């Protein structure tokens, strides 16, 4: 898999479906690899270690990245296998969870007085945006459900 091919494909004004699929696959692979790396870091580095804190923030940011091909059918997987990373609201919630943990560790790593450093400030701002987005999404779901119930025929 070559990043330059995907970058060239995405550089056009309207990316093709296959370019979007490739971009989504690379993003999902990056999230999977970062999550595996986090497992290893958590085994050898203590809570609040700067490297662990930074890695958590990067994993959260990767999960928060917009999905380009969320409507494309997933590859066929056994039904009992959990798909990682998730899509939609579950992915957004995963990003929020990683960023909350990152913020806690950044405050230990770089100090409470300066809000966990530059990365800590960026994580805080991103968390505010994501929590707002999650609230909007939840409100949209509630509205859609109410409309769906209202549109049902009454017997």
Functional labels for PLM-detected ranges:
Residues 1-155:
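Non-catalytic accessory regions of eukaryotic chromatin regulators
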């Amino acid at each position: 898999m070559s990043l330059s091919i995907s970058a060239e494909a995405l550089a056009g004004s309207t990316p093709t479906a296959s370019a979007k699929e490739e971009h989504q696959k690379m993003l999902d692979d990056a999230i999977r690899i970062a999550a595996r790396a986090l497992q290893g870091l958590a085994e050898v580095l203590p809570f609040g270690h700067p490297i662990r804190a930074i890695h958590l923030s990067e994993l959260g940011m990767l999960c928060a990245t917009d999905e380009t091909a969320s409507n494309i059918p997933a590859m066929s997987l056994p039904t009992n296998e959990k798909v990682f990373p998730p899509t939609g609201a579950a992915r957004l919630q995963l990003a929020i969870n990683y960023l909350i943990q990152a913020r806690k560790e950044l405050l230990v790593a770089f100090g409470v007085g300066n809000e966990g450093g530059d990365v800590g400030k960026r994580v805080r701002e991103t968390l505010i945006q994501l929590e707002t987005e999650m609230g909007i999404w939840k409100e949209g779901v509630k509205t859609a459900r109410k409309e769906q119930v209202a549109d049902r025929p009454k017997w």
